[in-house]
């Protein structure tokens, strides 16, 4: 039995690489609205106490999402999610929702609606359209796709455009489903520069879909030269007990020493654009499953002092990472995790047959609910740089030369990682189980 008005909402959250200029009309869809011009966030906005507190809450969400998703991941393969992509898609959903549905989403994000409205623009502008010297690129795109039969409130569309930098499209999911799905597929492929190209199969009952895409690409150095490999091969201990003989990439020195705990050790390398690749390496007697927890992820990403120097001796410390090339990905539905671990339940309840059902009346008077939260990622780290994220540059001393102690941090077993921007906003987080 079908309910014409009780149409499901599909939230599509994607993370990976690519951006192509969006045309005003896409085959299978019509542009209803476009975001206001993006003005880069100012230094004052980025260091404001309220925004710093907001990003701390976002990073708590990021650590929990990465850990919970990995806990439910049974593929045994390399794994990564993009917490900022999921966070942004849920923020768009919160703006479209009302009542208890909105409250549940905001509770999962640990913010009030006022906090979200006041800070999401700064967060977006700190990430979107970050292009440096034509070599570094970080791009985020928000969009909402509305079925032609769905009546929407213009005030909500305007808020999405102005506060969330969101494109709005009309597509005929009901009467020309193939064309509508084709438009969504091309949009995601274009915005991710071909890294994500899949058929999502949004049904003819789709009232609207919320889509976030993220693309990051950076090099290790200004000249674009490859990172050198080690002269010798290392035995990389895969999570399944096998060993792969491989040469490791030799990262540049960064100030500080390896952060060590009883369970794991951590350090980072950087890209040309100051994106950071942070490694979480299990110590002997522990596995990556043991140490890739929300608490440990948050601790490592919150580190600001790696002990760069010893003032009493004037000694400067520097460490470089030896690490393998790797690829990671994810393709799944996060709805179950969001319900079980984050308490977002009403969003997924059908108004046709469930009490306490989804309320999207800020966007539309038609009853609607969410059927899935599709999340797809692709990430590659190699000798050229990162498509997804990366890190670079060694801090220099000030004044007279200082004695320097140099260390090597060898990543020779299955490990966890975090990829962030220069302000430690998590773009990707995951686990490399094997190479």
Locate predicted features.
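Bacterial Sec-dependent N-terminal signal peptides
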Residues: 2-9
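Detector for small/aliphatic-rich hydrophobic stretches
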Residues: 9-13, 17, 24-173
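Non-catalytic interaction/Regulatory regions outside core domains
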Residues: 12, 25, 34-39, 371-378, ...
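Feature captures eukaryotic membrane-trafficking machinery centered on endolysosomal pathways
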Residues: 62-63, 78-102, 268, 403-435
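Non-catalytic, conformational "gating/processing" segments within enzyme and secreted inhibitor domains
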Residues: 76, 115-283, 306-402
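Short Gly/aromatic-enriched secondary-structure transition segments
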Residues: 105-109, 224-234, 290-298
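Short beta-strands and strand-coil junctions in structured, solvent-facing domains, enriched
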Residues: 286-287, 426
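Soluble, non-membrane globular domain cores that form compact, hydrophobic packing
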Residues: 300-303
């Amino acid at each position: 039995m079908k309910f014409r008005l009780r149409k499901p909402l599909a939230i599509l959250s994607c993370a990976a690489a690519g951006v192509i200029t969006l045309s005003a009309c896409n085959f299978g869809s019509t542009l209803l609205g476009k975001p206001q011009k993006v003005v880069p966030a100012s230094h004052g906005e980025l260091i404001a106490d309220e925004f710093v507190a907001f990003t701390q809450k976002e990073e708590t969400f990021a650590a929990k999402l990465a850990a919970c998703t990995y806990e439910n991941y049974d593929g045994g393969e390399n794994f990564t999610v993009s917490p900022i992509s999921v966070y942004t898609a849920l923020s768009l959903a919160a703006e479209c929702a009302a009542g208890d549905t909105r409250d549940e989403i905001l509770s999962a994000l640990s913010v009030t609606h006022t906090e979200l409205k006041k800070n999401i623009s700064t967060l977006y502008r700190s990430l979107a359209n970050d292009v440096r010297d034509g070599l570094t690129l970080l791009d985020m795109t928000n969009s909402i796709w509305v079925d032609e039969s769905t009546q929407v409130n213009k005030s909500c569309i305007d808020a999405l455009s102005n506060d969330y930098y969101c494109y709005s499209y009309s597509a005929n999911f009901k009467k020309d489903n193939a064309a509508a799905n084709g438009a969504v597929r091309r949009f995601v492929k274009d915005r991710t520069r071909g890294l994500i190209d899949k058929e999502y199969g949004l049904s003819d009952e789709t009232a609207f879909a919320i889509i976030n895409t993220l693309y990051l690409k950076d090099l290790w150095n200004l000249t674009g030269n490859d990172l050198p490999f080690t002269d010798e091969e290392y035995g990389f201990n895969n999570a399944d007990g096998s060993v792969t003989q491989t040469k490791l990439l030799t990262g540049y020195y960064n100030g500080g020493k390896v952060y060590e705990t009883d369970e794991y050790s951590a350090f980072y390398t950087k890209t040309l654009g100051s994106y950071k690749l942070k490694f979480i390496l299990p110590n002997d007697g522990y596995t990556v499953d043991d140490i890739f927890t929300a608490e440990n992820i948050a601790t490592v990403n919150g580190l600001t002092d790696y002990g760069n120097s010893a003032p009493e001796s004037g000694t400067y410390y520097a460490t470089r990472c030896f690490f393998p090339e790797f690829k990671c990905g994810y393709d799944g539905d996060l709805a179950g995790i969001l319900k079980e671990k984050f308490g977002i339940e009403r969003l997924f309840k059908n108004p046709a047959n469930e009490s306490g059902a989804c309320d999207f009346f800020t966007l539309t008077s038609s009853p609607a609910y969410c059927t899935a939260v599709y999340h797809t990622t692709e990430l590659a780290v190699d000798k050229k740089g990162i498509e997804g994220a990366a890190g670079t540059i060694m801090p220099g001393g000030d004044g007279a030369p200082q004695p320097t102690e140099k260390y090597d941090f060898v990543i020779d077993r299955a490990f966890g990682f975090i990829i962030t921007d220069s302000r430690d906003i998590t773009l990707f987080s995951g686990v490399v189980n094997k190479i």
